[in-house]
Amino acid sequence: MVFFPHRHLLGIKGLSHQDITLLLDKADEAVKISRQREKKTSTLRGLTQINLFFEASTRTQSSFELAGKRLGADVMNMSVGNSSVKKGETLIDTAMTLNAMRPDVLVVRHSSAGAAALLAQKVACSVVNAGDGQHEHPTQALLDALTIRRAKGELSGITVAICGDVLHSRVARSNIILLNQMGARVRVVAPATLLPSGIRDMSVEVFNDMKEGLKNADVVMMLRLQRERMSGSFVPSVREYFHYYGLDAEKLKAAKEDALVMHPGPMNRGVEIASEVADGPQSVIESQVEMGVAVRMAVMETLLVSQNQGERV
């Protein structure tokens, strides 16, 4: 058996090929559990998971909650809107308060990059990063990798085109790191205004034209246009953005005939993706949601078994 050497999951950066493979293999087992009639196990019975979301996210929070409950953990969702944070309590104060409750794992989403890492320094339990600013979203990258691997058989050697608002996307960053680590070829496709500085140093091919970027791709991963994170005008108009960078059936023809269409959600239909593609036969968007629960089950079990029992997983 292989030992998982990490106490926290703060990002994909720092995970080895072996670490990622271990989590994906364990997530494959979790898929089987989730498809059974009796979905609940006792793996984490007696352990406590706190979901601390400073940014609203129905999908991700629900996925983490379901993952914990399927493993038998006691799960508490902390509503920041009604918490002491709104009354002026700092992130560190919140961390110390929660630490005193002696949870076993803290799942945190925050608008500031590095928030999860900061909490990990202040609490005795494991910390899972559910998204921190524009930095990373590790479980999203893992669920995307699992979706691709189950559909294509492997990650090594495939070509993945990540398209859209790369600048503001923690999903893009985590996926680029993971896919490179696993031997995939990664392209990013976006207007120059939505590309971060230094993107060419991340071992990716950069395209400003959709059809060129999608040419013979095995996977087309669309990103949400994150207008809430934009302080200026990054695109002339939504209509023009869709014309040049929205994925429709015509643009998709540039990719391989059996290319997968992915989106981390929530989708802006008619902005970065057309309904005909999102709901089409090449779409694996619903599968991504299913794989999300499985991956988060795998992460929770791997971290908590390692931390609390010192077992090899």
From Swiss-Prot:
Pathway(s): Pyrimidine metabolism; UMP biosynthesis via de novo pathway; (S)-dihydroorotate from bicarbonate: step 2/3
MF annotations from Gene Ontology: amino acid binding; aspartate carbamoyltransferase activity
Pfam family, one: OTCace
Reaction it catalyzes: carbamoyl phosphate + L-aspartate = N-carbamoyl-L-aspartate + phosphate + H(+)
GO cellular component, one term: cytosol
This enzyme's EC code(s): 2.1.3.2
Positions that bind carbamoyl phosphate: R59, T60, R109, H137, Q140, G265, P266
Alphabetic keyword roster: Pyrimidine biosynthesis, Transferase
UniProt-annotated binding residues for L-aspartate: K87, R170, R224
A single GO BP: 'de novo' UMP biosynthetic process
Role this protein plays: Catalyzes the condensation of carbamoyl phosphate and aspartate to form carbamoyl aspartate and inorganic phosphate, the committed step in the de novo pyrimidine nucleotide biosynthesis pathway.
Family: Belongs to the aspartate/ornithine carbamoyltransferase superfamily. ATCase family.
Quaternary structure, from the entry: Heterododecamer (2C3:3R2) of six catalytic PyrB chains organized as two trimers (C3), and six regulatory PyrI chains organized as three dimers (R2).
Protein name: Aspartate carbamoyltransferase catalytic subunit
Gene: pyrB
